[in-house]
Amino acid sequence: MTVAPEGRKLLRLEVRNADTPIERKPPWIRVRARMGPEYTELKSLVRREGLHTVCEEAGCPNIFECWEDREATFLIGGDQCTRRCDFCQIDTGKPAELDRDEPRRVADSVRTMGLRYATVTGVARDDLPDGGAWLYAETVRAIKELNPSTGVELLIPDFNGRPDRLAEVFGSRPEVLAHNVETVPRIFKRIRPAFTYRRSLDVLTAAREAGLVTKSNLILGLGETPDEVRTALADLRGAGCDIITITQYLRPSARHHPVERWVKPEEFVEFARHAEELGFSGVLAGPLVRSSYRAGRLYRQAARARA
């Protein structure tokens, strides 16, 4: 393998990753498809209307439960990211020109799907003068204008920590402002070379100071130790993070970081208990948990804790 699917030459890191075959999943990494009436109706509607969600396109294992709750996730900014994280399946490259009509289309999709809660995430757009801040903020504004009763969670990149860009995004007032730290300090640069651990914590602190409910995610199985996970949880809580999800890394392809360890379900239970003891108001941890899983429920839980 010398060329990535998007046509670019593989990075040396990707070539090295590809030397390790794709790992066999343990027996507890299994999904049961429970297709309830809300899920069935939503799937039919999405097909009929030609709508696009991260839930389907990324093959999320939790789609059955989330759609049954009328929750879905949308990806904005295109399908090419200006940064590369070693766990992420989104392609790295030169993004297409900014699509200024995208916020309206996402808002229309939210209305057509009758969503109670929508998560919006996107690619990093370091090619744009504002890093994509307007696009993220405008998508929230468009959803809220067209769907005033729908909760919105916004999962953002770090916008290089620029206060003006963060202020633009925070001003759109999503119900939850999420920024995922993803891993622990020791291996952070190896996994997320275009981000910094400290800056990610600072983004969460700034969002909390702006009066927003804050959320982050940790991916396990990238080479961290249990003690490092506990330290990262304490760092996140200290930074003002309200909600935490803890997940198992599943390798998207051979060119991505190998799975270092399959974390057992009982370990996730222990990490969740530790997070609750630290004072997080919303906690979900498990092998198949993803950062937008049960997002609406976690928000309501955190909002009640604040009241």
Swiss-Prot record:
Q: Which reaction does it catalyse?
A: [[Fe-S] cluster scaffold protein carrying a second [4Fe-4S](2+) cluster] + N(6)-octanoyl-L-lysyl-[protein] + 2 oxidized [2Fe-2S]-[ferredoxin] + 2 S-adenosyl-L-methionine + 4 H(+) = [[Fe-S] cluster scaffold protein] + N(6)-[(R)-dihydrolipoyl]-L-lysyl-[protein] + 4 Fe(3+) + 2 hydrogen sulfide + 2 5'-deoxyadenosine + 2 L-methionine + 2 reduced [2Fe-2S]-[ferredoxin]
The residues that the entry says bind [4Fe-4S] cluster 2 are C81, C85, C88
Task: Tell me the pathway.
Answer: Protein modification; protein lipoylation via endogenous pathway; protein N(6)-(lipoyl)lysine from octanoyl-[acyl-carrier-protein]: step 2/2
Provide the binding site for [4Fe-4S] cluster 1. Answer: C55, C60, C66, S292
Q: Which domain of life is it from?
A: Bacteria
Enzyme class (EC, first level):
transferase
Record domain Radical SAM core: where: 67-281
Record keywords:
4Fe-4S, Cytoplasm, Iron, Iron-sulfur, Metal-binding, S-adenosyl-L-methionine, Transferase
Q: Where in the cell is it found?
A: Cytoplasm
Which cofactors are reported in the record for this sequence? [4Fe-4S] cluster
What NCBIfam families does the record tag this protein with?
A: lipA (TIGR00510), PRK05481.1 (NF004019), PRK12928.1 (NF009544)
Q: Which family does it belong to?
A: Belongs to the radical SAM superfamily. Lipoyl synthase family.
Record protein name field: Lipoyl synthase
Organism of derivation: Mycobacterium avium (strain 104)
Lineage, opening ranks = Bacteria, Bacillati, Actinomycetota, Actinomycetes, Mycobacteriales
